[in-house]
Structure formats: structure tokens, C-alpha cells
């Protein structure tokens, strides 16, 4: 997962693997020799997400800066003061659980203000990183199978600011394994692509093109054991 690129909105129902993919993106960016990663979430992770493997590189973990703003007000304050933070600028900004912050004040103008702050903060970090280097932005939003009118309004607003979106759908590839189908809409920057993501029993995450896209519809879910795309 690249650290730079257009802002990406990660969408999925509860348990669809949003946090696991955000954490995998953080580990990937932390190992690319770039700046640190800023991971924002409402509360500390209770355990390592799926896909982190049996061993973790301590050097990568040290480059992931976790911040836990407990409310929308505290999140606003953190983002507004980000330009004052000492040290190197992050190469990737992640926010997990956007829906929890939006639920505090469902007014569209508050949601628009929060999104603008996230985009401005990522742009500021990109400026600090220097020419040819950008700070990526990934935001995870939990969706419901039956969305209310407020959820529909929020999603429509978010899609205006995040033309690149990745929809996650959980699925079970086999006993002792967890998997999901990821559909990436790059927002006019390329064709829509679909991927099969498998979390094996040993904790490793495997990614392969969705079988029908790979040109072998008969290959079935077993093809998920292939290598990285």
C-alpha cells in the first residue's frame, strides 16, 4: 500500500477489516525509509490487528505515532496544532473510526469542517516533507447494511472530498482463516480493481487479484494463497 497518492476512504461494515488494513498500511509506510506515520483513533488497540504476522519489526512500530483523541473537539484541537508538532513530518496520516466522531455532531457543516482539517493537515505535512514527497491520507468509515438518512448525507459529502474509495466485504475463505473482498474505486485515476485479501491462521496477510479479474473464474477462492500483486 503506497503512502502517497490521492486521499483514500476505506468503507465497510463492522468486522470487515478496516483497522487491519490501516495498520498494514502503517507498517508498510514505516518500512519504506520515509517519515513516521500518524495513526489517529478514538481508543488504543486492544490487540494487534489481523495481517500483522507472527513477528513485528520493532523499528517499524517505533515509527508509528498513535494518538487517541477521545472526542471531536479533541480531534479538532490535535489537527489544528499539528503544524506545531516537533520532529519530522509524517509520510502517512491515518484516521480510524470516523463514524464515531461524526456521530457526536451529525450536522453536515461539522463533517465538512473535519474533512477539510484532515485534508489541510495532510497538505501541510506534504509541504514539510519537501518536493517530490507527499503525505498520504487514509480514513476508515464504518457503514451499516441499512443506512439512515444522516448516514447517506455523510457518505455523499465524504465522496466529494474522497474520490478514491475502497469498499470492503468480509468473507470466510476456509477453516481458521479470515478474508475479505476489496473493491478499489480510484476516482477517475484508473480502472476499478478488486482484490481478495486473506488473513491466514499464522497471522500473515495475502493479497491477490479477485479470481474473475485474474482471468481464471474457475480458480475459486483457493487462489488467495498467491503472492502480493
UniProtKB/Swiss-Prot annotation:
Gene3D superfamilies: P-loop containing nucleotide triphosphate hydrolases. ATPase which is preferentially stimulated by single-stranded DNA and is involved in homologous recombination repair (HRR). Has a DNA-binding activity which is independent of its ATPase activity. Changing residue 96 to A: Loss of function in HRR associated with altered ssDNA-stimulated ATPase activity. Residues 209-229 are annotated as: Disordered. Keywords: DNA damage, DNA recombination, DNA repair, DNA-binding, Nucleus. GO terms for molecular function: ATP hydrolysis activity; single-stranded DNA binding. It is found in: Nucleus. This is ATPase SWSAP1. GO terms for cellular component: nucleus; Shu complex. SUPFAM superfamilies: P-loop containing nucleoside triphosphate hydrolases (SSF52540). It comes from Homo sapiens. Interacts with ZSWIM7; they form a functional complex involved in homologous recombination repair and stabilize each other. Interacts with RAD51, RAD51B, RAD51C, RAD51D and XRCC3; involved in homologous recombination repair. GO terms for biological process: double-strand break repair via homologous recombination; protein stabilization. The gene is SWSAP1. It comes from the Eukaryota.
Amino acid at each position: 500500500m503506497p503512502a502517497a497518492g490521492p486521499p483514500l476512504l476505506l468503507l465497510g461494515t463492522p468486522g470487515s477489516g478496516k483497522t487491519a488494513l490501516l495498520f498494514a498500511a502503517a507498517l508498510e509506510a514505516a518500512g519504506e525509509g520515509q517519515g513516521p506515520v500518524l495513526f489517529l483513533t478514538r481508543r488504543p488497540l486492544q490487540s494487534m490487528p489481523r495481517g500483522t504476522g507472527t513477528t513485528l519489526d520493532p523499528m517499524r512500530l517505533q515509527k508509528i505515532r498513535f494518538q487517541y483523541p477521545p472526542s471531536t473537539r479533541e480531534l479538532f484541537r490535535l489537527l489544528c496544532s499539528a503544524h506545531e508538532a516537533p520532529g519530522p513530518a509524517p509520510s502517512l496520516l491515518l484516521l480510524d473510526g470516523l463514524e464515531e466522531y461524526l456521530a457526536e455532531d451529525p450536522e453536515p457543516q461539522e463533517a465538512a469542517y473535519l474533512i477539510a482539517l484532515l485534508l489541510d493537515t495532510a497538505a501541510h505535512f506534504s509541504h514539510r516533507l519537501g518536493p517530490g514527497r507527499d503525505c498520504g491520507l487514509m480514513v476508515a468509515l464504518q457503514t451499516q447494511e441499512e443506512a439512515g438518512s444522516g448516514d447517506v448525507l455523510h457518505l455523499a459529502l465524504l465522496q466529494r472530498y474522497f474520490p478514491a474509495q475502497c469498499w470492503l466485504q468480509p468473507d470466510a475463505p476456509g477453516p481458521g482463516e479470515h478474508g475479505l473482498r476489496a473493491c478499489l474505486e480510484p476516482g477517475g485515476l484508473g480502472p476499478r480493481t478488486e482484490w481478495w485479501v486473506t488473513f491466514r491462521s499464522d497471522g500473515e496477510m495475502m493479497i491477490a487479484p479477485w479470481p474473475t479479474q485474474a482471468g481464471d473464474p474457475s480458480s475459486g477462492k483457493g487462489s488467495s494463497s498467491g503472492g502480493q500483486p
